Amino acid sequence: MSRVAKAPVAIPAGVEVTLNEQTITVKGTKGSLTRVINSDVSVVVEDNEIKCSPVESAKTAAQAGTARALINNMVVGVTDGFVKKLQLVGVGYRAKLAGKDIDLTLGFSHPLVHKLPDGVTAECPSQTEIVLSGTDKQLIGQVAAEIRGYRPPEPYKGKGVRYADEQVRRKEAKKK
């Protein structure tokens, strides 16, 4: 069995977990998340813990580890939430909020407008920073990757949209 799947997920106080066949719902102070679990994995809720185990063969052990990690992310999301920070590096690169949209100026001939999905909130503490937050880790990472994808950091000057904790590997310019 997967080492990840062997560890049970602790259910903190104030979190309600509902298991209905292969659908798990986690409700907490920050919201509610629902996910369908693979049928190769059996999920059991007992003694304020969630345990995942593979149903049949060793081939499904990896699925059990994945299911356990997803459930843990749901529990952490509804209690603490997730935050992803982006930095805009470059002359004239700016971001500003307009309702549920982020207006981005990234050196193109036109401004870019990125619509935020439900469940993701954004803040712009400065013109060159974007802070995304919410309960669903996958959704926050997806939105951050889409925004970064408009102008990924380039290796020569380091300009572009990068994650706050990302190290951009720089290259030396060509010599004559």
UniProtKB/Swiss-Prot annotation:
Superkingdom of source: Bacteria
Keyword Acyltransferase appears in the UniProt entry: no
Record region (Disordered): 151-176
PANTHER family hit by this protein: 60S/50S RIBOSOMAL PROTEIN L6/L9, LARGE RIBOSOMAL SUBUNIT PROTEIN UL6M
Role description: This protein binds to the 23S rRNA, and is important in its secondary structure. It is located near the subunit interface in the base of the L7/L12 stalk, and near the tRNA binding site of the peptidyltransferase center.
Example GO BP: cytoplasmic translation
GO CC terms, sorted: cytosolic large ribosomal subunit
Ranges annotated as biased composition (Basic and acidic residues): 151-170
GO MF terms, alphabetically ordered: rRNA binding; structural constituent of ribosome
Source organism: Shewanella pealeana (strain ATCC 700345 / ANG-SQ1)
Quaternary structure and interacting proteins, as annotated: Part of the 50S ribosomal subunit.
Protein name listed in UniProt: Large ribosomal subunit protein uL6
Family per record: Belongs to the universal ribosomal protein uL6 family.
UniProt keywords, alphabetically: Ribonucleoprotein, Ribosomal protein, RNA-binding, rRNA-binding
Pfam families, A to Z: Ribosomal_L6
Keyword 4Fe-4S applies: no
